[in-house]
């Protein structure tokens, strides 16, 4: 299995609590002690929930960009034709008109459910990436853990948590096994497609969340 170095993306030691109160100086990390001091500063304006989520998504996007850069530098996947990439039959989450996230027909609650559900569906693919970046698991793990924190933030905004569909663990386990059994070339294509699709999903989510 080919591994990719991700030295360009320096990992941070995440805890879910820290992720949910990420400071304004993004993406530079701070310790919990430093964060407490900044919040206590007399002239410091606290970030709203929407602003924290906005910065949280940008942080993940920065990590994805660094990982994609490493892949593009070490393989020709980024230059492969769309036809070749399309041969990989992945069912990656994506936005559609019915999801209520586009300007036309925007629906806040429907869109929020789609974003949260989509991120939950991406988790199995992010787990797959942990095995693709064996020499630098911490870097890929930073994106994975930060995404978990983002999901929790969005779940707190949802009015109807029961409407958020959770992927079946057995189905995810089967999918992960199938992805890991691909030949080396297909695994490279899969890695590229996951990062590209996740980036596009987050960008669309970012635009929609700014309207909420």
UniProtKB/Swiss-Prot annotation:
Disulfide bonds join 72-78, 101-111. Residues 1-29 form the signal peptide. The modification Phosphoserine is found at residue 81. Gene3D superfamilies: 1.20.1250.10. InterPro entries: 4_helix_cytokine-like_core (IPR009079), IL-6-like (IPR003574), IL-6/GCSF/MGF (IPR030474), IL6/GCSF/MGF_CS (IPR030473). Its main location: secreted. GO terms for cellular component: extracellular space; interleukin-6 receptor complex. Glycans are attached at residues 73, 160, 172. It is found in: Secreted. It holds the Pfam family IL6. Keywords: Acute phase, Cytokine, Disulfide bond, Glycoprotein, Growth factor, Phosphoprotein, Secreted, Signal. One of its GO terms (biological process) is positive regulation of receptor signaling pathway via STAT. One of its GO terms (molecular function) is interleukin-6 receptor binding. Belongs to the IL-6 superfamily. Component of a hexamer of two molecules each of IL6, IL6R and IL6ST; first binds to IL6R to associate with the signaling subunit IL6ST. Interacts with IL6R (via the N-terminal ectodomain); this interaction may be affected by IL6R-binding with SORL1, hence decreasing IL6 cis signaling. Interacts with SORL1 (via the N-terminal ectodomain); this interaction leads to IL6 internalization and lysosomal degradation. May form a trimeric complex with the soluble SORL1 ectodomain and soluble IL6R receptor; this interaction might stabilize circulating IL6, hence promoting IL6 trans signaling. Cytokine with a wide variety of biological functions in immunity, tissue regeneration, and metabolism. Binds to IL6R, then the complex associates to the signaling subunit IL6ST/gp130 to trigger the intracellular IL6-signaling pathway. The interaction with the membrane-bound IL6R and IL6ST stimulates 'classic signaling', whereas the binding of IL6 and soluble IL6R to IL6ST stimulates 'trans-signaling'. Alternatively, 'cluster signaling' occurs when membrane-bound IL6:IL6R complexes on transmitter cells activate IL6ST receptors on neighboring receiver cells. This is Interleukin-6. It comes from Saimiri sciureus (Common squirrel monkey).
């Amino acid at each position: 299995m080919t591994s990719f170095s991700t030295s360009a993306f320096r990992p941070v030691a995440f805890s879910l609590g820290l992720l949910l109160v990420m400071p304004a100086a993004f993406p530079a990390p701070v310790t919990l002690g430093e964060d407490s001091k900044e919040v206590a500063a007399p002239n410091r304006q606290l970030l709203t929930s929407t602003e924290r989520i906005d910065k949280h998504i940008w942080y993940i996007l920065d990590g994805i960009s660094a990982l994609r850069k490493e892949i593009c530098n070490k393989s020709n996947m980024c230059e492969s034709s769309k036809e070749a990439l399309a041969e990989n039959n992945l069912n990656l989450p994506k936005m559609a008109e019915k999801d209520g996230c586009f300007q036309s027909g925007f629906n806040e609650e429907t869109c929020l459910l789609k974003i949260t559900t989509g991120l939950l569906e991406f988790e199995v693919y992010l787990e797959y990436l942990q095995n693709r970046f064996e020499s630098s698991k911490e870097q890929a793990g930073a994106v994975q853990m930060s995404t978990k924190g983002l999901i929790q933030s969005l779940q707190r905004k949802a009015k109807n948590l029961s409407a958020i569909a959770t992927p079946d663990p057995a189905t995810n386990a089967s999918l992960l096994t199938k992805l890991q059994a691909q030949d080396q070339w297909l695994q490279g294509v899969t890695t590229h497609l996951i990062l590209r699709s996740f980036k596009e999903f987050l960008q669309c989510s970012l635009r929609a969340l700014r309207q909420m």
